[in-house]
């Protein structure tokens, strides 16, 4: 019975591993990246502009947000 349980557990693990949806980001794409070249990302208008910039530039159409970094700096980051 323990051998059967081990085989079933291994089979279930394989099913889970192969069913995971992998998202890749490429360096030249806006998606999944932070963009310092976007400029300031401090006000509500900047957040709206960042979101629109990512919506227009990413194929996934998920938008973006102003991500906080060390020192309190915020930069535009597009969702994966």
From Swiss-Prot:
Subcellular location as annotated: Secreted
GO cellular component, as recorded: extracellular region
Disulphide-bonded residues: 31-80, 41-66, 50-76, 54-78
Keywords: Antimicrobial, Disulfide bond, Fungicide, Plant defense, Secreted, Signal
Signal peptide, first to last residue: 1-25
Main subcellular location of this protein, as a coarse class: secreted
Family: Belongs to the DEFL family.
Protein name: Putative defensin-like protein 23
């Amino acid at each position: 019975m323990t051998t059967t349980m081990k085989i079933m557990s291994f089979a279930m693990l394989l099913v889970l591993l192969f069913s995971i949806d992998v998202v890749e980001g490429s360096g030249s794409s806006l998606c999944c990246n932070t963009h310092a070249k976007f400029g300031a990302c401090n006000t509500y208008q900047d957040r709206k502009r960042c979101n629109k910039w990512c919506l227009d530039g990413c194929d996934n159409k998920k938008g973006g947000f102003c991500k906080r970094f060390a020192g309190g700096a915020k930069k535009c980051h597009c969702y994966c």
